[in-house]
Amino acid sequence: RYYYASRGLGDVYKRQTLRIREGDPLEIFTDREGEIILKKYSPIGELSQFAGEYAESLAQTTGHLVLITDCDHVVTASGTGKKEYEGKPISKQLEDAISERKNFLASRNDAEFVKVTLDDAGEFGQQALSTIICEGDAIGAVILYEKDEKSRMTETESKLAIAAAGFLGKQMEQ
């Protein structure tokens, strides 16, 4: 899966403005009008159909909203509320949690709780998050989200997120 950034000649943009991190693989093209097109490679994008099926199965089993992200966007979502998240850019908080390779279970009032997307309404009260690691690199996250604060997430949800992240990371290595 690729993400495109196209800018006219003469426009100067910082690497951070385009959400390009040091070491990110890019392809550079020019079109007929002379515009530069950057294609950013997303390793999880290769597994988007498989990741979607995995998320759907996990959502049906747990009853939670399940999100699978790369380091830039929500790649797939399954469960109640998925339309609000699928394809949206992730928040700086989540980007930091991924780069720090965090795995946690948190409630909305906990310091570790992160907004998933830039425009996350904050209607979910609990989350279990696990970073996807592939060949030693943090490439995304698996997040289980729960709206109802009365039905507490447990270590089971945390372990399910960790197992899903581990499995997806191993699939990427093949």
What are these regions (language model features)?
Residues 126-133:
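A short, aliphatic-rich beta-strand micro-motif
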Residues 38-41, 78-81, 117, 147-149:
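Short hinge/gating elements
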Residues 56-119:
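Structured interaction and signal-relay segments at domain junctions
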Residues 15-77:
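Intrinsically disordered, low-complexity terminal regulatory regions
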